[in-house]
C-alpha cells in the first residue's frame, strides 16, 4: 500500500504547487495554455518549463493511476476537492489535517515584554505569519489595511519578513524576521489580539491554528482552505481582497474583545487540530491499508 500525503497541488498539475492566484483551471483538462508563461511575477522566467506541463501531467496521470493500492491524504477538504476534480480523481482520498503541538503553542501570560520588544505598546496587535511573504501571501493587502486603521490604535506585525523586505515596508508596519524559536513565536501569537491570513491560496493555514492554540482569534479571506478553519466562535471570514470589509472585521474583533474568543480558539486547536490526534488518524489509515483486500 502507498499513502501519499499532499500539502500542495503539485501532484495533480503539470508542475504548479498552487494555481488559484493565477485563476487557472487548466489542470482539470491537461495544463494547456499555462497562464504562468511570460509572467515574471509568477515564474515566467521558467516559461520553457511551463510549456512542458501538458506532457508532465500526462506522465503523472499514467504513473499515479498505475499504482494499484494508492491513497491520497490531503490536509483540507478544499484540497481533497481539487484532487477529486483532477485527472487522477479516481484515486481514493482521505482528509487528515495538519497538526499543532498544543504543548508548545499555548496562551502565554508574559506578553508585555514581546510587545515592548517590537514597539507595539498598548495598540491592538494584528499579526500575520509566513515563511515567505509575497503578493499571493497578501503582503500588499497588509499595506493597504494599515492605511485604513488609525495608527495610534492599531499595529500590524508581520513575522517572516526578510531583511530586504524589512527595509522597504511602509511606516506603521512592524517587520519581524523569521524565527526558529517556537517559544518566541508562541509569545507573538499570545500577544496578538488577532492573527490573520490574507493569502490568496492556502491548502491549510497552519499559522491560524497555531494562533488558536495560543488563544487568539482569526480573520481570514474566504478562499481555498482558510474558511474551513474559522467560525463565529473563533473569528471572522471576509471576502478576498475587500479591504473595507477586512478593516471592518478587524474593528469588530477589537470591539468584541479577544477574551470572547480565546477559550473556543484553544478548544478547537486541542480537539480538532492537536498533532497527536492527527497521528492517530494516520495509524488507523495505515492499519486499514494493511488489511488484505477481499477478492
Task: List each language-model region with its residue ranges.
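Nucleotide-activated donor-binding/catalytic signature segment of Leloir-type glycosyltransferases, i.e.
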Residues: 160-186
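A charged, aromatic-enriched C-terminal amphipathic alpha-helix characteristic of glycosyltransferases
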Residues: 259-290
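Short hydrophobic beta-strand element within catalytic cores of glycosyltransferases
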Residues: 217-220
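Short alpha-helical donor nucleotide-sugar binding micro-motif in glycosyltransferases
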Residues: 187-192
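Conserved donor-binding/catalytic core segment of Leloir-type glycosyltransferases
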Residues: 73, 119-137, 143-146
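Aromatic "clamp/platform" in nucleotide-sugar-dependent glycosyltransferases that forms part
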Residues: 200
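Membrane-proximal helix-turn-helix segments that form the acceptor-binding/catalytic region
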Residues: 10, 26-72, 81, 85-87, ...
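Conserved acidic donor-binding segment of nucleotide-sugar-dependent glycosyltransferases
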Residues: 232, 236-243, 252-258
Amino acid at each position: 500500500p502507498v499513502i501519499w500525503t499532499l500539502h500542495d497541488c503539485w501532484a495533480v498539475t503539470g508542475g504548479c504547487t498552487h494555481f488559484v492566484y493565477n485563476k487557472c483551471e487548466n489542470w482539470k483538462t491537461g495544463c494547456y495554455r499555462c497562464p504562468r508563461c511570460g509572467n515574471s511575477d509568477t515564474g515566467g522566467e521558467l516559461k520553457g518549463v511551463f510549456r512542458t506541463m501538458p506532457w508532465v501531467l500526462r506522465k503523472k496521470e499514467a504513473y499515479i493511476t498505475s499504482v494499484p493500492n494508492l491513497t491520497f491524504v490531503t490536509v483540507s477538504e478544499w484540497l481533497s476537492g481539487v484532487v477529486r476534480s483532477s485527472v487522477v480523481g479516481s484515486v481514493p482520498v482521505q482528509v487528515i489535517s495538519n497538526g499543532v503541538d498544543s504543548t508548545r503553542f499555548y496562551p502565554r501570560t508574559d506578553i508585555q515584554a514581546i510587545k515592548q520588544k517590537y514597539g507595539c505598546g498598548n495598540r491592538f496587535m494584528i499579526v500575520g505569519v509566513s515563511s515567505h511573504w509575497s503578493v499571493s501571501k497578501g503582503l500588499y493587502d497588509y499595506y493597504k489595511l494599515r492605511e485604513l486603521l488609525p495608527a495610534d490604535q492599531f499595529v500590524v506585525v508581520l513575522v517572516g519578513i526578510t531583511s530586504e523586505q524589512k527595509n522597504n515596508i511602509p511606516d506603521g508596519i512592524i517587520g519581524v524576521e523569521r524565527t526558529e524559536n517556537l517559544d518566541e513565536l508562541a509569545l507573538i501569537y499570545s500577544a496578538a489580539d488577532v492573527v490573520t491570513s490574507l493569502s490568496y491560496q492556502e491548502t491549510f493555514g497552519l499559522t491560524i491554528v497555531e494562533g488558536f492554540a495560543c488563544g487568539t482569534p482569526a480573520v481570514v479571506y474566504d478562499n481555498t482552505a482558510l474558511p474551513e478553519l474559522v467560525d463565529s466562535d473563533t473569528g471572522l471570514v471576509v471576502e478576498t481582497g475587500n479591504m473595507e470589509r477586512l478593516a471592518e472585521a478587524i474593528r469588530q474583533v477589537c470591539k468584541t474583545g479577544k477574551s470572547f474568543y480565546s477559550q473556543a480558539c484553544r478548544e478547537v486547536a486541542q480537539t480538532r487540530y492537536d498533532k497527536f490526534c492527527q497521528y492517530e488518524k494516520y495509524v488507523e489509515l495505515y492499519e486499514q491499508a494493511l488489511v488484505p483486500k477481499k477478492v
